[in-house]
């Protein structure tokens, strides 16, 4: 017996089932004869030749079935069980698709379906954009090339990038400095703004993309075939990659944030392994890491949020461990080999935190208290346990080789002590204390560097599509070495590189040709996504600085020389800013719904834009 459902006419249309052509009168479907169906001999429409239906030019769609009509009466227990099991089966098929072949999930399809509710899943538009991004990444990985892009801070920049850049990047640093949510308080990149800030910027840019796409489509619908053939197509639907910082809190915050990003239009997000509340820009000092396991939990949580939505958004795992010097906890044994402690601390020495607390109680504050901390740190030898073992047993190189072999890859500190005792005897175990030098906030000291970054990145690899090492210098050889190490265990894994404006590129010995080929050279090593995160910030600052300075001296001559003439020469559509904004599109909308509006048309004969 069919299930009782609301009466509604439902038509399922595949984007590959037919082709469309544009004409001045609008849209027209083309159908051509095809092979007859076996059941009755009726002819089926055949898709006309079209690049839109070609696998090489379109993204593979998410394997989410179309929604079913809602019920008007409750299901029986049997129907309810059938609904659940059939949905589980479809989700299992989705998870087993090639799209997720390299993604590990520590949960099941049943876990996903049980959290969805009874409303049929309809993935957000960002899922389509994610599919497009995935196809772009695949193509570049195959060709050993890279997607390179610039950070955009507003719809103007985004629209101008659309002609050359395949993707758009939204930086948390930029949002913190130019667009924050709620209180509009701008400041440095500490991720202390409301967690809706970057998603709101994404929504702003995504809606602008849709607007310019509609405007562009409408213009082409009113062109002749010859005009369309000579007018370049502009793809405004560029996947947006956004900065999710640390996830902005605990796992419930990560869950909400990932969901919000998907709903607001982000095709991909990146999350870094810094501590929320202690986060710094990747090129600043004072960074505090979370445990390896905590960041993995963040990645898993974001994926679970998207799976509930039925969305195939892309996750980028970033590590800041190359230059980090602190870690929030020693709970994860995978981090133990990089945690530093005080070696051969004199008996009776008070810990750093205890020393600082005593001095504060005595009224010592500010710079004087900083000096107390500096003196304490200068008076101890701060090393990892393995370094302490090597120093303590320097006279036994052969035994040290055995020790290094047995702790290779990392073991817990307790296990490392046991191994040292077994090899060197009790006296060979150094006096080493990782609690004594803990900071006032309780953080442990951490030995950052490439080894730590490689280990962490490999731990994050099964949970994300791309991996990002935040580097402290633009070093091509170092980046290539990092890529080689990652690809030993994860062949072909996609990598990200930040072409950061925080680097003084002119001070690193690059020739002009080195700079010209830097991106393509990195692309050969698997860095398929490369971005100048703050390009929008710097380009806006530069042109505004130059224009303001010249305008003060030369008045309108400065504007015409620096802006209007260059707009005309470069071919930017911003020269005619009314048309760029969509005024002509809106006129057509109003003329469609209300006749006799030509006299009030914003782009009528009196518009000054006709002088261009």
Task: Show which residues each predicted segment covers.
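Short beta-strand elements of ligand-binding domains
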Residues: 496-498
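Short secondary-structure junctions
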Residues: 143-144
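Active-site beta-alpha connecting loops in nucleotide-dependent enzymes
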Residues: 508
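A broad, structure-centric signal for solvent-exposed, well-ordered loop/edge residues
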Residues: 8, 12, 107, 177, ...
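N-terminal mitochondrial targeting presequence
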Residues: 1-73
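A short pocket-lining beta-strand/turn micro-motif at the edge of beta-sheets
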Residues: 30, 493, 528-531
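Alpha/beta enzyme core
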Residues: 105-106, 113-115, 131-140, 149-494, ...
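Extended, intrinsically disordered, low-complexity segments
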Residues: 70-73, 77-80, 84-87, 91, ...
């Amino acid at each position: 017996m069919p299930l009782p459902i609301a009466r509604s006419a439902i038509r399922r249309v595949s984007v590959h089932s037919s082709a469309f052509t544009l004409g001045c009168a609008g849209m027209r479907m083309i159908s051509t004869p095809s092979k007859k169906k076996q059941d009755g001999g009726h002819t089926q429409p055949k898709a006309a030749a079209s690049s839109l239906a070609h696998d090489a030019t379109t993204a593979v769609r998410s394997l989410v079935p179309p929604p079913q009509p809602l019920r008007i009466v409750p299901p029986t227990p049997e129907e309810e069980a059938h609904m659940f099991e059939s949905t589980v089966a479809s989700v299992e098929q989705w998870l087993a698709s090639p799209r997720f072949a390299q993604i590990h999930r520590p949960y099941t399809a049943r876990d996903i379906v049980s959290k969805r509710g009874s409303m049929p899943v309809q993935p957000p538009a960002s899922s389509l954009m994610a599919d497009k991004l995935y196809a772009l990444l695949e193509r570049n990985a195959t060709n050993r090339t890279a997607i390179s892009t610039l950070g955009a801070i507003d719809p103007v920049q985004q629209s101008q990038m659309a002609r050359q850049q395949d993707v758009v990047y939204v930086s948390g640093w930029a949002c913190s400095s130019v667009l924050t949510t709620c209180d509009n308080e701008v400041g440095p990149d500490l991720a202390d703004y409301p967690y809706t800030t970057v998603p709101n910027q994404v929504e702003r840019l995504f809606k602008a993309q849709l607007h310019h796409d509609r405007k562009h489509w409408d213009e082409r619908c009113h062109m002749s075939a010859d005009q369309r053939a000579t007018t370049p197509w502009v793809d405004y639907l560029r996947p947006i990659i956004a900065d999710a910082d640390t996830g902005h809190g605990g796992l419930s915050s990560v869950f909400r944030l990932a969901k919000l990003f998907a709903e607001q239009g982000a095709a991909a997000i990146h999350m870094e392994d810094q501590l929320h509340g202690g986060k710094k820009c990747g090129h600043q000092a004072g960074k505090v890491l979370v445990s390896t396991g905590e960041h993995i939990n963040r990645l898993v949580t974001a994926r679970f949020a998207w799976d509930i939505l039925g969305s195939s958004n892309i996750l980028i795992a970033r590590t800041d461990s190359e230059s980090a010097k602190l870690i929030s906890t020693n709970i994860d044994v995978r981090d133990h080999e990089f945690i530093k402690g005080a070696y051969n601390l004199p008996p009776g020495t008070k810990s750093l935190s205890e020393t600082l607390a005593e001095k504060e109680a005595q009224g010592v504050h500010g710079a004087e208290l900083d000096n107390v901390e500096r003196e304490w740190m200068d008076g101890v030898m701060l090393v990892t346990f393995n370094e302490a073992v090597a120093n303590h047993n320097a006279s036994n190189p052969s035994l040290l080789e055995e020790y290094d072999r047995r702790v290779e890859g990392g073991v817990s500190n307790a296990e490392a002590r046991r191994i040292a005792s077994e090899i060197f005897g009790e006296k060979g175990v150094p006096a080493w204390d990782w609690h004594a030098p803990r900071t006032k906030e309780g953080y442990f000291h951490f030995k950052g560097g490439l080894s730590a970054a490689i280990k962490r990145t490999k731990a994050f690899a099964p949970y994300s599509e791309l991996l990002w090492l935040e580097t402290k210098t633009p070093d091509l050889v170092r980046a290539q070495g990092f890529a080689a190490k990652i690809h030993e265990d994860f062949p072909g894994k996609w990598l990200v590189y930040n072409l950061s404006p925080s680097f003084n590129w002119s001070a690193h010995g690059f020739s002009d040709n080195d700079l010209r080929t830097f991106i393509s050279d990195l692309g050969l090593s698997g860095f398929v996504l490369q971005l100048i995160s703050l390009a929008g910030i710097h380009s806006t600052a530069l042109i505004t600085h130059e224009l303001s300075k010249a305008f003060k001296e030369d008045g309108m001559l400065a504007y015409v020389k620096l802006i209007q003439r260059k707009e005309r020469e470069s071919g930017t559509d911003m020269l005619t800013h009314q048309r760029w904004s969509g005024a002509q599109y809106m006129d057509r909308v109003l003329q469609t719904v209300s006749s006799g509006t030509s006299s009030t048309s914003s782009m009528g004969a009196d518009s000054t834009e006709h002088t261009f």
